[in-house]
């Protein structure tokens, strides 16, 4: 504003000066012109000084106004800041109030829900109270009814009590009477027992004497059994030696026949329609002869056990023990070969076993708690030739059929009869060895009969060298059975002929 006023005041001065300058070179003279210029300059200076003073005053006023405006502006700025701060405070307060309002609304909704639930609970409690009041009325009525029933039961119980009390008094009197009578009977029986003590002692003495007599009988029986077993072992050894010799003779006979008739197998196949492997038979026979020996092992008999009673009058639990040195494999082979023997030997063995079972049952009844004799029989250590003989007799079969009568020479018939005799004796002794190994001791007469019959067959069976033509006698029957067994054993097969 001050600049605008100064520009307005200087504008006429400049215009006058321009007019003087424009006029001076043309019309003025040099002397008058300098004075006029000086006057003009003085005038201009005065006007300028006046204008400067005016401008100073104006400037001072404007400065004062500016200071006042600045102070007002500062106060306005302070007021604006205060108002802004107050506005922020009010906004925060408003937000807190709004949050408080929301919290109060939530509390209000929760309280309204709780009020509704309390109202429902109050209604339910009222209904329950009504039901309880009804049930209380029913309970009171039931109580009155039960009270009446209880009074009736108490009255009946009192009556029963009185009745049973009378009955108990009667029973007590009867019991006292029974005790007195029983006491009298007990005294009578006690007197009788005391009078019978002497008779009991006498009976016990006689029983002990009989028991000692039975012990002596059992000792004698076991001694006889051991003697019989020793005899049997000797016979078995003799028979084994004889069977070995017969087997060697048969092997030599077959070798002689092979040397004399090299085509013997073809002839047998042609005549008998039987396929046979003579080399395998010879090999099995030689193997049996080499592996069988009767000189290495001896017969060992175990003495009879002590049967004297102990201090308390009882016999020891282990009276007889069974000891067998024959291998498990040899025993199984011997049993398998013995099971395929003839029916006559199995029948005799079954009879002896049944007699043995009845004898053992009777002995057990006499002994009381004593162990049976068949379970703990005295063991006999027999030579291993039983299993070897049985296996050799089952493997080294002769290929000839005993029922064919006209197609073979004297040597073949003689070999067949020798083999049948050896097979019969092997079957009998094999069955006896099976019974001995499993603890079955037959009765005395049965064992003696078996030994006698077997020995007579083994010694007298060779007389029928040409008996193959008839089926009579034990040798022919056993030959037929042995041939059937040999057909089943697989050593030779029946050839399939074209005219079957």
Swiss-Prot record:
Residues 41-185 form a coiled coil. Keywords: Coiled coil, Endoplasmic reticulum, Membrane, mRNA transport, RNA-binding, Transport. Residues 1-35, 324-437, 453-500 are annotated as: Disordered. Residues 1-12, 418-431 have a biased composition (Polar residues). It is found in: Endoplasmic reticulum membrane. One of its GO terms (cellular component) is endoplasmic reticulum membrane. Residues 332-360, 381-406, 468-484 have a biased composition (Low complexity). It holds the Pfam family SHE3. InterPro entries: She3. It is a peripheral membrane protein. GO terms for biological process: endoplasmic reticulum inheritance; mRNA transport. One of its GO terms (molecular function) is RNA binding. Belongs to the SHE3 family. RNA-binding protein that binds specific mRNAs including the ASH1 mRNA, coding for a repressor of the HO endonuclease. Part of the mRNA localization machinery that restricts accumulation of certain proteins to the bud and in the daughter cell. Required for the delivery of cortical endoplasmic reticulum into the emerging bud. This is SWI5-dependent HO expression protein 3. It comes from Lodderomyces elongisporus (strain ATCC 11503 / CBS 2605 / JCM 1781 / NBRC 1676 / NRRL YB-4239). The gene is SHE3.
